C-alpha cells in the first residue's frame, strides 16, 4: 500500500458517552469482532480490555483514554477510549483534539444525559464529525425514537436515521438497514458473530418506508444532480446514498444514527461498517492549523506523508514495564526510531527511542510511523501534554490545547519522611500526565495542596499515588477552589526604590487594572484566558527588556489575591507608563514594583470573591420531586428546568460547589435511594456578601 493510499485507509476515532451508556462494552465488542481480542471482556466483572488501570477495573468506569489499533475490512481503525465520568472531561477534550471522527454512544433508556451533552459540545468545539449509536436496545424502557428526538432537541443536532430496531426490549433481535432496505437479524447462539439479511418484516414495512423517505430527502440536498434524479422519480443507487451520507457526515450537515445492543452482541458489525464508510480519514480533514516558528505566522499545514514531520503529544502515561509513554498523533511526515526531533513549545530536542502501537495494555514495537498514525513513544524527557514535536529544520507549533481550571482542592501530607521524597516525585509525574491536575504549596501552612476537577478525580490520584508509587499520605477535607476578581477599573502609579549602599534598585510602573468582561478590544486568543497582560509603553519609558519582569511579577502575585489570598482571575493589566534608572534598574526591580503595584492597586478595583457553580442534574421519581427541589433551594441552588423523562423527573439546577459536599447521602435519604445525580463545572460567580464574610473569617 503506498503511503498516500495508506492515509485514506486510516480512521482515527473516539468512542464518547455518558458514564454507563455502554461505551467500554461497545469498544470491547469492536475489538472482539476485529480479531484483536479473543475473549469478550465485561466491565461488570472487571475484565474489560480497554479499562486497564486497576482503579478502572474495580469501579467499572473508564478513566484513561487507552489508544488501540485494530483492522476492519482493509482499514486501520485507531480507537481512543474516552472516559464518561464528568471528573475526566479533560481526557475527553484531549482525545477529541487528535481524532478525525467520533461515535457518540447513547443509552437507549436514558437518552441524552448531561455528560453526553458536555462531550457533544466539546466535539463541536473541535469540529469532530460524528455518528450516534443508540445502545442498550434490549433493556426495559429502551425507546429508539425518543432518543432520536432528544438528539434533536437537547443537542440541537440533525439526526439522520440509518437503522430502525427490530423488536423492542428483551425481544430486540436486529435492525432494519434503511440504505439497503433489508432486515439484519442476529443469531444469539453465535455470540453475535453470525447474522443474516432478510426481508423487512411486514409489520415494519410502512415505518421503514417513512424513514427511508426522510433519509433520502436529507441526503439528496447535498448534490443537485442526484436531487434532480430523485425528484424525477428515478431510483437513487446504494452507492450514491453512501457517498452522500459520507459527504454530509464529514461536513456535519447531519449525524447518522444507528442502533444495537453491544452487551447482547447485536449491531456491532454494521457500526464498524459505518465507521469505515462514513467517518473521515486524515485526508478528508486535509489541513491542520499551526504556527511556523521561523516567521511566527499562523498557517494551514497539509496532512501528508511527504511533508516535514509534525505531531501533537496528547497524553502521557506511566507504564509499569516501559516507564513514561507519550502518545502522539502524527499529522504530517514520518518518524523512525533513532532520529532526533524538536519539541517546539519547549525548544528542546528529543531523541526517538522505542515506538509502540498500543492495544489497550498490550504493546507492539514498530520501527517507523507516518502521517495519520497514533503511536506511543517511550523515554521522552521534556514533552508534556499539548506539546508539538516537529522536524528540526522545518519547525511548527500546532495549536495548543486549552485545559480547564481545577475547582476542588485538598491538602496531602506524607505519613513518614520516607514518603516525603516519593510523594514529590509521584505528584510531579501525575501532574505531567494530567494537565487538569495541579500541585502547589500553601505558603502559610507549608502543606502540599492538590487540585482537580472533582472529588472522584482527586480520589483516583491519591489511589494511584498509593498503588503505583507506594506513597502513604494523610488527606485533608476537600476545599472549594475559590477565586477573586475586580469589578471596576483602577489605576496605580508605583515607584520601587532601594538605596542601601552598593547597587540600588529602581523601577516605576503605572498600571491600569480592569475586569476582562469590560475590555472592548480583546484579541481572539485572549478570550479564554483568566489573566491578560499588555504593554502600551511608547518612547522607551520602560525599556523592552524590563517589560517581561512586570508580567512575571503580576503573574506570580496574582496567585494570592487581596481579599482572602485566593488566586485573582478575569482581569487585564496594562502597563501604560513608567521610569527607569540607567544603573539601578533591572528585571528584578520591575518584578518587585509590579507585585507592590498589584497589592496597592487591586483593593481600589472593588475586589469580590468568586466560587465555582456546578450544573447539577437530578433524576428522581415524581413523588420525591418537591423535597429534592426544596433541598436544592436550601443549598443556594437556582432551578433551571424540570422535564419528564419516562416515569421520572429531571431537575437541572445551578448550585455552588461549596453546598454540594455530601449531597450523595442526602439525596439517597430523600429518595430512599431511588434518585441519582450528576454534576459538572459550569462557571464562576460572585459569592453573596454574608457568605463571603464567613469565608474570609476562616482564612
UniProtKB/Swiss-Prot annotation:
* Primary location recorded for the protein, binned into one broad class: cytoplasm
Where does this one sit in the cell? Cytoplasm
Instruction: Provide the Gene Ontology terms for cellular component.
Output: cytoplasm
One Pfam short name: EFG_IV
Report the sequence similarity comment from the record. Answer: Belongs to the TRAFAC class translation factor GTPase superfamily. Classic translation factor GTPase family. EF-G/EF-2 subfamily.
* Gene Ontology biological-process entries: ribosome disassembly
Give the protein name, as stated in the record.
Elongation factor G
Q: Which residues bind GTP?
A: 17-24, 81-85, 135-138
Protein species of origin: Rickettsia akari (strain Hartford)
Keywords from UniProt, A to Z, are: Cytoplasm, Elongation factor, GTP-binding, Nucleotide-binding, Protein biosynthesis
**Can you give the residue ranges of the tr-type G domain?**
8-283
Top-rank lineage group of the source organism: Bacteria
Q: Which gene encodes it?
A: fusA
Enumerate the InterPro entries for this protein: EF-G-like_DII (IPR053905), EFG_II (IPR041095), EFG_III (IPR009022), EFG_III/V (IPR035647), EFG_IV (IPR047872), EFG_V (IPR035649), EFG_V-like (IPR000640), G_TR_CS (IPR031157)
Q: Name one GO molecular function term.
A: GTPase activity
Summary of the function given for this chain in its UniProt record: Catalyzes the GTP-dependent ribosomal translocation step during translation elongation. During this step, the ribosome changes from the pre-translocational (PRE) to the post-translocational (POST) state as the newly formed A-site-bound peptidyl-tRNA and P-site-bound deacylated tRNA move to the P and E sites, respectively. Catalyzes the coordinated movement of the two tRNA molecules, the mRNA and conformational changes in the ribosome.
Amino acid at each position: 500500500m503506498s503511503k498516500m493510499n495508506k492515509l485514506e485507509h486510516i480512521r482515527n476515532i473516539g468512542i464518547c458517552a455518558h458514564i454507563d451508556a455502554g461505551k467500554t462494552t461497545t469498544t470491547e465488542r469492536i475489538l472482539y469482532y476485529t480479531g484483536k481480542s479473543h475473549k469478550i471482556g465485561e466491565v461488570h466483572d472487571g475484565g474489560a480490555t480497554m479499562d486497564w488501570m486497576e482503579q478502572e477495573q474495580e469501579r467499572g468506569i473508564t478513566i484513561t483514554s487507552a489508544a488501540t489499533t485494530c483492522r476492519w475490512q482493509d482499514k486501520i481503525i485507531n480507537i481512543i477510549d474516552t472516559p464518561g465520568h464528568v471528573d475526566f472531561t479533560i481526557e475527553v477534550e484531549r482525545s477529541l483534539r487528535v481524532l478525525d471522527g467520533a461515535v457518540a454512544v447513547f443509552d437507549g433508556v436514558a437518552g441524552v444525559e448531561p455528560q453526553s451533552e458536555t462531550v457533544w459540545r466539546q466535539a463541536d468545539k473541535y469540529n469532530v464529525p460524528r455518528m450516534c449509536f443508540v445502545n442498550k436496545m434490549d433493556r426495559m424502557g429502551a425507546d429508539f425514537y425518543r432518543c432520536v428526538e432528544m438528539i434533536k432537541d437537547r443537542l440541537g443536532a440533525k439526526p439522520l436515521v440509518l437503522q430502525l430496531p427490530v423488536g423492542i426490549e428483551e425481544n430486540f433481535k436486529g435492525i432494519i438497514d434503511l440504505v439497503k432496505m433489508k432486515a439484519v437479524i442476529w443469531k444469539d447462539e453465535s455470540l453475535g458473530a453470525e447474522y443474516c439479511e432478510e426481508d423487512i418484516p411486514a409489520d415494519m414495512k410502512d415505518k421503514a418506508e417513512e424513514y427511508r423517505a426522510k433519509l433520502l430527502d436529507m441526503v439528496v440536498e447535498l448534490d443537485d444532480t442526484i436531487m434532480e434524479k430523485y425528484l424525477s422519480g428515478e431510483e437513487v443507487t446504494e452507492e450514491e446514498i453512501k457517498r452522500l451520507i459520507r459527504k454530509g457526515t464529514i461536513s456535519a450537515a447531519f449525524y447518522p444514527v444507528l442502533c444495537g445492543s453491544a452487551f447482547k452482541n447485536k449491531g456491532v458489525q454494521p457500526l464498524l461498517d459505518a465507521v469505515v464508510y462514513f467517518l473521515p480519514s486524515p485526508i478528508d480533514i486535509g489541513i491542520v492549523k499551526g504556527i511556523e516558528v521561523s516567521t511566527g505566522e499562523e498557517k494551514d499545514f497539509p496532512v501528508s506523508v511527504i511533508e516535514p514531520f509534525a505531531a501533537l503529544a496528547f497524553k502521557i502515561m506511566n507504564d509499569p514495564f516501559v516507564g513514561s509513554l507519550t502518545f502522539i498523533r502524527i499529522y504530517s511526515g514520518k518518524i523512525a526510531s533513532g532520529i532526533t526531533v524538536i519539541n517546539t513549545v519547549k525548544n528542546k530536542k528529543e531523541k526517538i527511542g522505542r515506538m509502540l502501537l498500543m492495544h489497550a495494555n498490550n504493546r507492539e514495537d514498530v520501527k517507523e510511523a507516518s502521517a495519520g498514525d497514533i503511536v506511543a513513544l517511550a523515554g521522552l524527557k521534556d514533552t508534556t501534554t499539548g506539546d508539538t514535536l516537529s522536524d528540526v529544520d522545518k519547525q511548527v507549533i500546532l495549536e495548543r490545547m486549552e485545559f480547564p481550571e481545577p475547582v476542588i482542592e485538598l491538602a496531602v501530607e506524607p505519613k513518614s519522611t520516607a514518603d516525603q521524597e516519593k510523594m514529590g516525585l509521584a505528584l510531579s509525574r501525575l501532574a505531567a500526565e494530567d494537565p487538569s491536575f495541579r500541585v502547589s504549596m500553601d505558603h502559610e501552612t507549608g502543606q502540599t495542596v492538590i487540585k482537580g476537577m472533582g472529588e472522584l478525580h482527586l480520589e483516583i490520584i491519591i489511589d494511584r499515588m498509593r498503588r503505583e508509587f507506594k506513597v502513604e499520605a494523610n488527606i485533608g477535607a476537600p476545599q472549594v477552589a475559590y477565586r477573586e476578581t475586580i469589578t471596576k477599573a483602577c489605576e496605580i502609579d508605583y515607584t520601587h526604590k532601594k538605596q542601601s549602599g552598593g547597587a540600588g534598585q529602581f523601577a516605576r510602573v503605572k498600571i491600569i487594572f480592569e475586569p476582562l468582561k469590560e475590555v472592548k478590544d480583546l484579541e481572539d486568543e485572549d478570550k479564554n484566558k483568566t489573566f491578560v497582560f499588555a504593554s502600551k509603553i511608547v518612547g522607551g519609558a520602560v525599556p523592552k527588556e524590563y517589560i517581561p519582569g512586570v508580567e512575571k511579577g503580576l503573574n506570580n502575585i496574582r496567585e494570592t489575591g487581596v481579599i482572602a489570598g485566593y488566586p485573582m482571575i478575569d482581569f487585564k493589566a496594562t502597563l501604560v507608563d513608567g521610569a527607569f534608572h540607567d544603573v539601578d534598574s533591572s528585571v528584578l526591580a520591575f518584578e518587585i514594583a509590579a507585585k507592590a503595584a498589584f497589592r496597592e492597586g487591586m483593593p481600589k478595583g472593588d475586589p469580590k470573591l468568586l466560587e465555582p457553580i456546578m450544573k447539577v442534574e437530578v433524576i428522581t421519581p415524581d413523588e420525591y420531586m418537591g423535597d429534592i427541589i426544596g433541598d436544592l433551594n436550601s443549598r443556594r441552588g437556582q432551578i433551571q428546568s424540570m422535564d419528564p423523562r419516562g416515569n421520572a423527573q429531571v431537575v437541572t439546577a445551578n448550585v455552588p460547589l461549596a453546598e454540594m459536599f455530601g449531597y450523595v447521602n442526602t439525596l439517597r435519604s430523600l429518595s430512599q435511594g431511588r434518585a441519582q445525580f450528576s454534576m459538572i463545572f459550569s462557571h464562576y460567580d460572585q459569592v453573596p456578601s454574608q457568605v463571603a464574610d464567613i469565608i474570609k473569617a476562616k482564612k
